[in-house]
Structures are given as structure tokens and as C-alpha cells.
């Protein structure tokens, strides 16, 4: 998509959106994808989906409270990603893991960064 995927796949300060709750949740999504890469089983996949869905709910709640202008299109991107990851089964193929990593990196830096200072 555009931004480089970090190796090892870990959150770093370049992903900071400056809302502690959201930064902590982004870290947790990174960790959950990393966990699937290293222990490609149904439990880790379920945790990845749950952590991601919970984060999206929290982030969307903050956006809604702030009357964030791009809420609808942002929410749609979340929904589309959830459809993909909820459709996965373990073991997850390398192509799908790459997709999840790429999506997260580019979503945070390309989309989430647009709400910095607006929530």
C-alpha cells in the first residue's frame, strides 16, 4: 500500500497518534498479529480479531463523541477489515498475515493520523 512494514513487527513511536488509549490499543493489535505469526493457531487468531474489534469500537466512540468529519468512511474501512479477518481460519496463510500487517501499518499512518488533534 505505501508504508514499510516494520521487522520485527512491533509498534514504535512512528505509529503514535497521541491518544494514550488508542496508542495502547494499536500496540495490542501489533502484538496480536505478531502472536499469530509466531503461534499460528485458533486461540491467537481469535484474540487478534477480538483485540482489533474492541479497538475499532473504542476509536469509533471517540470519533463519534468528537463529531469527527470522516467518521463514516473511517468506520467503513474498519468494517471491511473485520470482514476479512473474521473470515480467516488457523493456520493463517503467509499472504493473509502480510495483508493484516500491511493493512494495519497503512491504516494507522495513512488514515488514523488524519484524526490527530481532532478527537
Swiss-Prot record:
Fe cation 2 binds at residues 59, 74, 78, 107, 112. Pfam families: Hemerythrin. Signal peptide: none annotated. Fe cation 1 binds at residues 26, 55, 59, 112. Keywords: Iron, Metal-binding, Oxygen transport, Transport. GO terms for molecular function: iron ion binding; oxygen carrier activity. The keyword Metal-binding applies. InterPro entries: Haemerythrin (IPR002063), Haemerythrin_Fe_BS (IPR016131), Hemerythrin (IPR050669), Hemerythrin-like (IPR012312), Hemerythrin-like_sf (IPR035938), Hemerythrin_metal-bd (IPR012827). Belongs to the hemerythrin family. Hemerythrin is a respiratory protein in blood cells of certain marine worms. The oxygen-binding site in each chain contains two iron atoms. PANTHER family: BACTERIOHEMERYTHRIN (PTHR37164:SF1). This is Hemerythrin.
